[in-house]
Every structure is written in structure tokens, then in C-alpha cells.
């Protein structure tokens, strides 16, 4: 379950930022996890709830945004929604498709007090 290592990394990053800002509490955290990032959102939330116990973010609200996954056809330039890595362009039928969004995993925002 790599979601626990991701949750621990997020906790470490937020803890470091909270220290820099001399915050006493983290009240909200927003993550972005693309559909193609390989992250199971519910598992991440579960692991995160365990990882924050006893920290300044223990009571923080965790929000996870899942952006649309998009591909770009390198033949005709069509941009379209994708569900996986091996995708055919709906316009020209080419398989020369580059994934342009949906693989990301990042901290979008944190709210500190």
C-alpha cells in the first residue's frame, strides 16, 4: 500500500511548512490526485487519518480534488478526456497520444492558524 508512504510524505511537507510559518494548527488541506496517478483516494484518506494522529493537523479537513485526465493527439492535435494510458484519438484513430493531465499528485493548499 503505497498510499501510507504518500500520506507520510504529505504530513512531513505540511509539518515543515507549518514550522516555517510558525503555525500552531493546520485546519484544512487540499490535495490534487489525478485519476492516472495510481493513488487510491479512499486508501489515501484512511492512511492520512492515521498519519496525522498526534500532529498539528490531526483535526484538519482533508479534501482531495481529482482533475480530469486529458490526452493530446500528436498527429492531429485533438485534446480529449482519457481513462487510461493506452488510448486512441477519437478524431483520427491514432495511438500517438500524450497524457497531458491526470498523472499529478500534489498539495494544492493548506490553511494554517
Swiss-Prot record:
Give the UniProt keywords, A-Z: Metal-binding, Nickel, Zinc
InterPro entries named in the record: Hydgase_Ni_incorp_HypA/HybF_CS (IPR020538), HypA/HybF (IPR000688)
A single GO molecular function term of this UniProt record: nickel cation binding
In this chain, Ni(2+) is annotated as bound at 2
Q: Quick one: which residues bind Zn(2+)?
A: 73, 76, 89, 92
Q: Does the keyword Zinc apply?
A: yes
Q: What does the entry give for GO biological process?
A: protein maturation; protein modification process
PANTHER family the record matches: HYDROGENASE MATURATION FACTOR HYPA (PTHR34535:SF3)
Regarding protein family, the annotation reads:
Belongs to the HypA/HybF family.
HAMAP family from the xrefs? Answer: HypA_HybF (MF_00213)
Q: What is this protein called?
A: Hydrogenase maturation factor HypA
Q: Which organism is it from?
A: Prosthecochloris aestuarii (strain DSM 271 / SK 413)
Q: What is this organism's lineage?
A: Bacteria, Pseudomonadati, Chlorobiota, Chlorobiia, Chlorobiales
This protein's gene is called: hypA
Amino acid at each position: 500500500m503505497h498510499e501510507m508512504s504518500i500520506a507520510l510524505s504529505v504530513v512531513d511537507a505540511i509539518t515543515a511548512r507549518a514550522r516555517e510559518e510558525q503555525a500552531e494548527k493546520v485546519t484544512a488541506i487540499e490535495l490534487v490526485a489525478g485519476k492516472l496517478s495510481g493513488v487510491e483516494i479512499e486508501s489515501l484518506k484512511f492512511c492520512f487519518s492515521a498519519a496525522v494522529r498526534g500532529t498539528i493537523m490531526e483535526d484538519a479537513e482533508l479534501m482531495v480534488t481529482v482533475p480530469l485526465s486529458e490526452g493530446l493527439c500528436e498527429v492531429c492535435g485533438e485534446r480529449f478526456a482519457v481513462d487510461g494510458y493506452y488510448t486512441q484519438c477519437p478524431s483520427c484513430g491514432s495511438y500517438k497520444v500524450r497524457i497531458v493531465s491526470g498523472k499529478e499528485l500534489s498539495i494544492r493548499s493548506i490553511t494554517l492558524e
